[in-house]
């Protein structure tokens, strides 16, 4: 945009010449925290607003997902705080059982060559607390760097004494209400870490495997419809056949339905097992016969329950074949329905070695029919890295069906709303098919299960051993041992909204801030965390009428931040970007070290190095926290996948610089000047009236966007107003009044400059807090505001009476006319400073009025020597024409353009574009490129092609115009 200089000499503004986030951010945050601005205001007569943070793992460090969600939360908290609400952002960290235990185990192994067993349970747990004291603050310090206005004095940890009491209380009450029980069921077992793990900790990998077709002989001389004395079963896990207790066929399958109720003689073991009819057997798949191993497969477990088949566990917790099998009935009680003998040659061998041995034996006996290549999904533990074994173990469970019923109703009747709404369906699909929840883990670090056993195996549940002895009249002569297991971390985080506010005590905080207002979370933990919080909260917390209370009124689901090519960010891909590296900047060397150092798979390092050098040849520049936050807000669309975009980050850093420089211009023209704050006549120009009306409309649209959780729209509204309307237009439009206006007009322009800037800073503050506070501290002096911080200033409100339709339409028309002139200059290669004469043809009454009322203004802004209205019958010289609303703008070309030179220039430009178009079309017609390149890359190429074609069309049109001169 062309700039007209402000001619008066002004003093240097109090704002530094360049915006330097590094110098501003941390001192400012420390000041905010020390001043107590993050705390609730304590005014309980005011409406409260509370968000609880999804507690990050105490072992963790800040990643893009955290930065994304926390930016959204802080934007909401700052917005509500500025509306005078009693605001609490409750923070804390999760003890992250398995993750933390592994971090400390690795540490003592590396530093001392010891295992946790060398320490023993108590000493090892002390070691973890010691580690937490030293390293556990990393993530909270990083959260401070993001500008999060969290009440740090209320920070909680899921193993704090208060939260531990809440966990015990919840467990005991659920047990007393028969909603917690101990049972033998199938779980995901990690043979390396020796613990049950949740589905979320299971990573399903696609692998090339085999399908073994095995012959199972029929008992008692029975034959199939085809006269065969055997069935063929197909399996991907032949080692589990030692635990088979049935063979399933589809009851509709004509080949086998007459065999239902007959028996098989299981090879290698000679166990007689029944043939059962079950829908689980698919007639179209494999041979239509499925071996059933209820103790080692989740589907088989369900089939076994339906047909009351015994369960035979053939594996140890290490994943080796047992010396003696464990035989249980369908209820998990020890059974003698089958022998527990296992042939000696398989005893004690590792499960995958057993697979080879068993297949070899089938082959020797002539019972191996064929081996087919087969693509299959294999579950791995995401931390232990080994294949997960479905294992029959004694675990503690929560009966979820009665809890889920209430939790489903809360969403159905609108007490809890999901944003975007489509996530409700995901919630319902989980909740309507809910299984009992396994809450015990075989770890040392975590909330130990509050259950004790006597020597006869009787179980007693209570808040402490003292309570158990007292309630059950157990003398000190009776020995009690506490359950060794700890609770799933999701159990304690399921109580998060109310345990952090003091439950089971009926605290003021609980009364004031519960139910909380909004939960911000990723859709990947909708079941593991969100659903469980709803179930637990509604069970334990009731309102004054005894109605179950929801944990939060709204659930705002964020998408997943992926890299620029749409790939998930992961260490093994080497595409993780640390949010703080974008804030502070990082050299290429340091970035490479970060991405390739300590890799689990060092062979990937070279590929990652090349990719990183290509993407960040000079490392990553400093962008500052505000630019990062603005980018994250702008990317917060309603989609599931959000591709990170470094160009947008650079664009929003430029935005911060633009706002800084605009503020310097405003301060230069207002500091120590008469801005009409103390009376004195004020005349507002059309430009002043327009920007005030424009700002008022912006406030309305911006608030609507924030109120409906459209942070992407809010960011765009803020960007558009600040960059385009305020900086590019209004600052230019204000110069004629400032430089040449009357005293009243100068006062009006100054008043408008400071008024709009101060309002804009308050408007932008929730998204970009640091830069807005820094500038506002200077602006408040000009405006005579006494307050200490922008954080507690009132948020701008839309005022119907400030609507000025006439100013909006008049100035939009003038802008359109000036843009038409500027476009002609650019297209015809006319110097920006060259004064032009403009003719207006077919001007309607509105256009004529606007020119008459604002002639000087239009001439100054368009660098025009004259504006002439042509009568309808008047002939115009050869001109370039643009249509605008209610008129045609003509600029006579005589003496302005060197026709031949201009045509030659345009031909060169067109030739260059043709080459580029050819190259892109070549790429896109290459099937190999289109099928192999990431979707985002192909889309970018298609966009480039469309842009090149548009540019070419424009150049051809210009060429035609010039050729006609």
From Swiss-Prot:
Subcellular location: Cytoplasm
Motif 'HIGH' region, chain ranges: 56-66
GO CC annotations on file: cytosol
Physiological role: Catalyzes the attachment of valine to tRNA(Val). As ValRS can inadvertently accommodate and process structurally similar amino acids such as threonine, to avoid such errors, it has a 'posttransfer' editing activity that hydrolyzes mischarged Thr-tRNA(Val) in a tRNA-dependent manner.
PANTHER family associated with the record: VALINE--TRNA LIGASE, CHLOROPLASTIC_MITOCHONDRIAL 2, VALYL-TRNA SYNTHETASES
UniProt family annotation: Belongs to the class-I aminoacyl-tRNA synthetase family. ValS type 1 subfamily.
Record protein name field: Valine--tRNA ligase
Name of the gene this protein is made from: valS
